[in-house]
């Protein structure tokens, strides 16, 4: 029995990824997938309590898409989960394509 599908993407060398750009990209990918956005939020970290970077999330009617960036080590971890009809792989593929275009190599 399956209760959903979970896809993850880790990007290294993610230096200079802007949190607002990432959240906008996530929303665009969600909208293109046909999923219904419920809420979105970004939290930027200055390194005081957490490592510098950001965490962003787009809540979906059927689950979520999130991204966590650790700018001090250049790591961007993205995941998409759906317990509905939305294919999270489609969301991740759209995000990855835009990241590769903006940050080739």
What are the functions of these language-model segments?
Residues 1-105:
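Polybasic/polar functional segments that serve as interface/processing modules
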């Amino acid at each position: 029995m399956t209760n959903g599908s979970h896809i993850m993407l880790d990007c290294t060398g993610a230096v200079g990824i802007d949190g607002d750009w990432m959240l906008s990209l996530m929303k665009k990918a969600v909208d293109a997938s046909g999923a219904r956005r419920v809420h979105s939020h970004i939290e930027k970290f200055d390194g005081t309590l957490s490592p510098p970077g950001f965490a962003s999330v787009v809540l979906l009617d059927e689950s979520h898409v999130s991204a966590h960036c650790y700018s001090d080590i250049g790591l961007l971890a993205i995941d998409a989960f759906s317990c509905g009809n939305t294919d999270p792989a489609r969301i991740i593929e759209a995000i990855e394509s835009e990241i590769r275009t903006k940050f080739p190599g």
